[in-house]
Amino acid sequence: MTRSRRIARVAAIGGAAVLACATLTTVPAQAVPRADAPVGTVTLQSKRADWIDYPWLGASGFEWKHSGSNDPVHQVDYDGFVPPTHAGPDDLPSGTDVVSTRSGSTVTQKHRSTSVAATLTIPAGQTYKQAVGWSALTEDASGIPHILRAAADGTTTDRVVKGVPAGAEITEYVKGGSVRSVGLVYKLGGKLSAGLVDLRDGAFRTYVTDVDDVHDDVSFNDRWFVADWKAVRVDAPPGTAPTVLGGWDFPVTHFAVVGDQLLIGSVSNYGEADPDLIALSLVTGDTETLLNESYGYVTPSPDGSALATAGPSALDWNVYRVKPSADGAAVSEKVVRISTKAIGVEALALGGGELFAYSDSGNGFSSFALDATGRPVGPQTDRGQSNMVDCPDGDVGCPQAEALGDGRFASVTSKWVDMDNGGPESVLIYGPDAKTTTKVYVGDRLGGIPGGTGRYVLYNGASPGVQKVVDSVTGSTVGRVTVSRTRTAASVWGQVLWAAGTTNGSVVGLSLRTNRTVATIATGAPCKPTDLQAVNTWLYWSCGARGPAGVYDRATKRAVKVPSGASPARLADGYLVREDRTTHELRLTDFHTGQAITRTVAVLPATDVTRGASGGRWAVDKFGGHIAYLTGTAGEVAIVNSGVPASGLAQLEADTATGVDGATSANPWQPRWQLNKPASWTLTLSTRAGRTARVLTGRSTGAAVRASWNGLRADGTRVKGTYVWKLTAKPRDAQGPALTLTGETNVY
């Protein structure tokens, strides 16, 4: 994929509180006035700290921008800087604050803190190479370097650099931590050498010969010159052999010399090397960590300092100024925090009050917590990297992600990436943290996930007839295929697989625990459904693009006709959402009262049209939640409240079995209850005589309650026996009564 779009900005619209690093976001223009106003937005931010470019840096401050972007250039001024009393081309040290710009044969120089200006004219036949302070470096047709400077009368002085070996081909003009010198790398006799031009008199001196063309970095200041991990003092007598600095290799490089310290680190932030910025003393050989978690280039400044980026994450990524102290050491100070960078969303899922977003720019998956109304209530959270199949450009429905309502989400991954044929696939379940995944091999190619709940995920392969149900026990990294069947319209809700029957309108429920039929429903559909979805007691069916569609309520045995069409629809709790791919309207049909009432909740951008499943640029939370969609602004996702009351709290499936050794500290009892919507919970453990032994409380992860008991009573004692547990769950949305469940567990 070629789309690339950083840690999240989150806004709650219509609320008083705005989260840290948040900006209040208005309703997208295309969604007004026909659509509902979002209750909030989130912006997906890159989890990778960005490289920073410095268009200019000097004694009074610097300019920075995100590398490779069209973002504006930001200007930073150093606190306490005092401009010099005199500045100009006749005072080379004052050049540490000069900004040079070139247009054709003219170089304009401006002293940033005093506004003193000068203009240079590049002589005919010379090529501009570099600018350092009040000096500009050019090269004539013979390859000889020249130093240009403005004279008091407005003319340009031209000094030929002396001392470059005859026949040398200059390959690089290098700026360092000095306004008095410029570095030259040259090739002679097939070998590289490096040295300095003294800008005061134009004299060149070679300091290091036989430079490795792989390690040809050059760093210097007014004290030291370093090339190819060989260091020598600038004022050393001619012919002084450089000192070899051992023990360092690619991808570690040296960036700058500050005082007597060589700054060493790694450009990459992909785990190839130690991320710390190290200061190596060129006097003693000792090293110390100057900055932790520092990536990207360290850039020398002509005033002898340097700029580096560091921080624990992109959310706390900063520019540091490294300055020399009086004794030649290097000290760092934080100067400015770098703003995060929004990146595009390539997959979107919503379930149990959590919004999941995927970016193919190396971000992987992230999640955002939402409250009961759909408002964002937390920062962007890392949910792990991905081994996705490759996807066509512009298809935001690929890769697919399906929220499971228990804090996890599922996707399809292939053994290898093959755009034409795909690879043997697995269903990959992420979470509930960024490190835990469950991978189940399904063996088909180019398949998808039409749905899933908790531990069960439905997979449809691209091969004719392939349909499987994956059982991924929560908390385990091991799963299995529990059902392999001939493909029909089907859906998983809780521990039941609902599938089209053999006659028109017939839907059969299969228990995934017992593999037995638990229900046969006559929905009234005049066909064998081509699409079937189940949420709570609702069954949605469709007879195809040109046929009718409806919803059947298993509780009331009531059937409701709903809008049909060629575009995919998604069933949620009491409502159905369908995208009109002609008008790009996202339409919600509320059927919970038995009557179908349709309204437009969003108008989607006309670009990035999903070619496959309904997921990608919009998603619904079938676990008592709402609707999310891409606004068209890079990385931005809006959440709109469904306006439909959720069903009462109910259990979908559970695992409360006690281990063979009972509850222990090493192997605690870890029951799990999958509910149909988020809740807070209290788990009371009592003796059979009714005495309370322990009370545990918490909030569901998604819509799943997970508890852990080590067998100890509240007083810390362990008493063997059978204990009665009672789970009381209260719905987070305050709609409907609390749910109470009971059972037994053992302490041996």
PLM-predicted stretches and their roles:
Residues A342-G344, A638-P668, E744-Y748:
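Short, compositionally biased P/S/T/A/G/V-rich stretches that sit at domain boundaries
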Residues R691-R718:
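Glycine-centered tight-turn motifs at strand-turn-strand junctions
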Residues R554, T728-Y748:
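C-terminal tail/sorting-segment detector
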Residues F62, F225, L539-W541, P668-K677, ...:
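Aromatic/hydrophobic beta-strand junction motif of beta-rich domains
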